[in-house]
């Protein structure tokens, strides 16, 4: 059973009306294609009717078997790939590179050379409880889909598509990391499985293969970076698909919900760069991916959670912008579709390593998987907010935390940042009533908001406090500043409304003569003029001040700072109309005149 076709999506019970279901236990050869790697064909084992049937070099280990519910008489039926009828069992030596160019023309395979077809065998009546089938949302629907839409391509060997059970012959040796499901929680990481459904989300024209997990333990010696949860599944590295890996393949447009994963094969992040993990010919693998890619995130993320090898900054330094790279995924992260029962389900099932996704073999009963949207949301949040924490070996709790806050740590971090609190929150509601608590600390701000113009804009235009410290009229509150209206003083009505002094011609002539002699009065001269002309000293003093101001204004002797500010459009406090020259200068500096 463990060797029962690792890539076939048909491991669900086939509908009874399926016209090709041969109920006889035909023994088919599960052929795994290797890249041009000298390792001999290891998995050409014909699984007949026993679960623990004879197996070649990669017979299921006890770890694998614990991940699969043994189903005794296992009937293998041959699924047709197209109109060619059932596929003959491929001989083991068919293992070399016969079907290299068959799939690249298929529209949904997106020319990933990895996705080569393999003999699609599945038990007709017995349900295979391999974890990937249980978790995939195609559980029980695969064969129906396949019947409705036969494959366009001829029968070919369907190779193990990268997710996880990569054939050892295909993988490059990374001996320092030993993959063992028993003590490597990364193998059981729910992200691996959820990535799996993503990677094989049923596309309308053909069922994409789903690889059962059990074979994984037989690959302990190799670095099997399971592609479905390879870099692109980890939202931290969604963008590092294109950026970090040295794979020269183009990024293909995504066609599933949040298809970080359809691009997995292109920019393979694994050390053995999965460009062609399962591609039959060495030519394509050599062509697309350098054998030992210098992908920094590759070795870091093969196990996606190896605490010793995991440098959390590697992901961030590779530049993750989910919004830019995968808008749909980003949108799902930010606006997660809430599936009502999923949080409780995940929380109840969550063993530490297995994360309640049924990956421990003990819970091999099919779950009601919610639609992929929320699942993607939980998986994609695993990496995003926990990027800074230690290792995520409690992978289940990380997935749970994203959906129901079950994990400690920032897995429950909010996807969207809270807006910065505005300086005067109460003024949003108060509108024009400006004298609210937030503004009362700043005297200048009160004068701003108490003005009619700013008061009406206060609800929409809230500015930080430092803005109101500036004295220039270019402040964002716009428009000229308004001074606070002074409260009328009761005592000085006569002072405030003193009528304008009307000087007689004799008085004016005398004042002009004095002014021509000396523009500035001394106290003695002021007293003398006051006695002669019958005027107050204050009136004489003010007349001299006004006369000096008029002459200064007419001679255009402006303060250089005032001229500079006026040229920038900042100095509009003039109490006297501008002269022609000043208006022209200001308009020219403002760009209104060429």
From Swiss-Prot:
Gene Ontology MF terms: DNA-binding transcription factor activity, RNA polymerase II-specific; RNA polymerase II cis-regulatory region sequence-specific DNA binding
Record's compositionally biased regions (Polar residues): 237-247, 426-436, 448-458
Composition bias, Basic residues: 92-112
Compositionally biased region (Basic and acidic residues): 487-499
Domain of life: Eukaryota
Record bears the keyword Nucleus: yes
Low complexity: bias regions: 22-60, 278-299, 387-402
Amino acid composition bias (Pro residues), ranges on this chain: 151-164
Record InterPro entries: Engrailed_Homeobox_TFs, HD, HD_engrailed, HD_metazoa, Homeobox-engrailed_C-terminal, Homeobox-engrailed_CS, Homeobox_CS, Homeodomain-like_sf
An example Gene Ontology CC term for this record: nucleus
This protein's record includes keyword Nucleus: yes
DNA-binding positions: 496-555
Compartment list: Nucleus
GO biological process: cell differentiation; nervous system development; regulation of transcription by RNA polymerase II; segment polarity determination
Chief location bin: nucleus
Record keywords: Developmental protein, DNA-binding, Homeobox, Nucleus, Segmentation polarity protein
Region (Disordered): 1-64, 76-127, 141-164, 198-217, 231-299, 387-458, 474-501
Family: Belongs to the engrailed homeobox family.
Function field: This protein specifies the body segmentation pattern. It is required for the development of the central nervous system. Transcriptional regulator that repress activated promoters.
Matching PANTHER family: HOMEOBOX PROTEIN ENGRAILED, SEGMENTATION POLARITY HOMEOBOX PROTEIN ENGRAILED
Protein name: Segmentation polarity homeobox protein engrailed
